[in-house]
From Swiss-Prot:
InterPro entries: Spider_toxin_CSTX_knottin. This is U6-lycotoxin-Ls1g. Contains 4 disulfide bonds. Belongs to the neurotoxin 19 (CSTX) family. 06 (U6-Lctx) subfamily. Residues 1-21 form the signal peptide. Residues 22-25 form a propeptide. It comes from Lycosa singoriensis. GO terms for cellular component: extracellular region. It holds the Pfam family Toxin_35. Coiled coil: none annotated. Keywords: Disulfide bond, Secreted, Signal, Toxin. GO terms for molecular function: toxin activity.
Amino acid sequence: MKLLLFTALVLVVISLIEVEAENERACIPLEKECTKTPGNCCSGLKCDCYRRFEQGVAKGVQCWCIEKDVTYKGV
């Protein structure tokens, strides 16, 4: 009986530690790169990706945290 209670207590403590660690994960602020972690922008922001070209040659994709309801157009 004591072993069962001890095991349950350990599981509860581990679960609480995991939840706390997830809540403390830092979000990515406005206009910072989110290419590797697209779901980690701060609240009110979205991760928007663009394909980058240099002299007509694709050089990869880059993503940035931007405001959700804002649309950017090329100049």
